[in-house]
Amino acid sequence: MAIAFKSGVFFLQSPKSQIGFRHSSPPDSSLSFKRFTPMASLSTSSPTLGLADTFTQLKKQGKVAFIPYITAGDPDLSTTAEALKVLDACGSDIIELGVPYSDPLADGPVIQAAATRSLERGTNLDSILEMLDKVVPQISCPISLFTYYNPILKRGLGKFMSSIRAVGVQGLVVPDVPLEETEMLRKEALNNDIELVLLTTPTTPTERMKLIVDASEGFIYLVSSIGVTGARSSVSGKVQSLLKDIKEATDKPVAVGFGISKPEHVKQIAGWGADGVIVGSAMVKLLGDAKSPTEGLKELEKLTKSLKSALL
């Protein structure tokens, strides 16, 4: 299967029947969420700002948003809960939480492997929501879910939106739905106060990009390169001109993601005028490669601090 960039989001060039979301026996609901305390003090206040409002506040302070991504349930949901606290305590402004899916065609090998491990442990949407219901009140930054469309369809658009909002989720990214097919998604998101973030890419024509930025809520997700997610050695110089084009079309904040893994990447993108920087595979790899969950969380803290400091 190939991924084409259509309408500024990922359009899967594959048969319409997709591999279904794997449902395994639900994990033990008595999850422990108190295993690890980072060196930075943990916040215990509920998020009060949504995505767009977070960017507005940061802009007033002359700051750029740091947005890390991790996969829910890798290596397990208890560790995910602790990771969310660590990311929040280390100064993350928004956190993207990936819902594992069996056919994640927009993702590179690191996040694909994390999704596979998570699904094999029995992670599903219900267990993720149960975890978030307990953890969101303990953190101060908003959570945005990153999920493929299949899990949403399985639950039903309205029920999905209401259930994620009920546990405190503020934003949503659905990478495999082209713009023309987002109308119902946007309607249900609006009805449930969920900010639906849309993506634009280096191959998106200017006129289509303008339609995307007009429809996007929360912020504009600028994909920095063609292809799947994954750390890269450098950031494409095209990002600077893409940012300029988008900012000429909208006043909405723009965050850049895909391939960003180092403090120098973060600093460079911020210098080009991005309102936010998204880092995913580097975070996921640390948690996946660690010898133990505690080691992974400590390494996650170190990386988060180094990336965040590049924006200060």
Curated annotation (Swiss-Prot):
GO terms for biological process: auxin biosynthetic process; defense response by callose deposition in cell wall; defense response to bacterium; gravitropism; L-tryptophan biosynthetic process. Transmembrane segments: none annotated. This is Tryptophan synthase alpha chain, chloroplastic. It comes from Arabidopsis thaliana. One of its GO terms (cellular component) is chloroplast. It catalyses: (1S,2R)-1-C-(indol-3-yl)glycerol 3-phosphate + L-serine = D-glyceraldehyde 3-phosphate + L-tryptophan + H2O; (1S,2R)-1-C-(indol-3-yl)glycerol 3-phosphate = indole + D-glyceraldehyde 3-phosphate. Tetramer of two alpha and two beta chains. It is an enzyme of class 4 (lyase). It holds the Pfam family Trp_syntA. Disulfide bonds: none annotated. Mostly expressed in roots, hypocotyls and leaves, and, to a lower extent, in seedlings, cotyledons, stems, inflorescences, flowers, siliques and seeds. Pathway: Amino-acid biosynthesis; L-tryptophan biosynthesis; L-tryptophan from chorismate: step 5/5. The alpha subunit is responsible for the aldol cleavage of indoleglycerol phosphate to indole and glyceraldehyde 3-phosphate. Required for tryptophan biosynthesis. Contributes to the tryptophan-independent indole biosynthesis, and possibly to auxin production. Keywords: Amino-acid biosynthesis, Aromatic amino acid biosynthesis, Auxin biosynthesis, Chloroplast, Lyase, Plastid, Transit peptide, Tryptophan biosynthesis. Belongs to the TrpA family. Disruption phenotype: Compressed root wave phenotype on tilted agar surfaces. Reduced accumulation of tryptophan, but increased levels of auxin. It is found in: Plastid, Chloroplast stroma. Residues 1-40 form a transit peptide. The lineage of its organism: Eukaryota, Viridiplantae, Streptophyta, Embryophyta, Tracheophyta. HAMAP family: Trp_synth_alpha. Its EC number is 4.2.1.20, 4.1.2.8. Its main location: plastid. It comes from the Eukaryota. One of its GO terms (molecular function) is tryptophan synthase activity. Signal peptide: none annotated. The active site is at E96, D107.
